Amino acid sequence: MDSLKIIEHARRLFAAHGDKAEAEAAQKASAFEADGDSEQAEVWQKIRAAVHEMRQGHQS
């Protein structure tokens, strides 16, 4: 997934879940990792990082 799609997905997740979005993304990443899907786990880690950045900006 390219960077723009990751950011867009993070925005939608943040809009839907607010401050819980980062935890939601982390859970998805863990679930994919547990299932052996490291590619999707990496995508969700990137989404989590993007949500984290959004939360930091939102708190300022």
Question: Where would I find each of the regions flagged by the language model?
Answer:
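N-terminal cationic and glycine-rich segments that engage phosphates or anionic surfaces
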Residues: 49
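Short, charged, amphipathic alpha-helical segments
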Residues: 38, 42-46
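Long, non-catalytic architectural segments outside compact domain cores
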Residues: 1-27, 31, 35, 39, ...
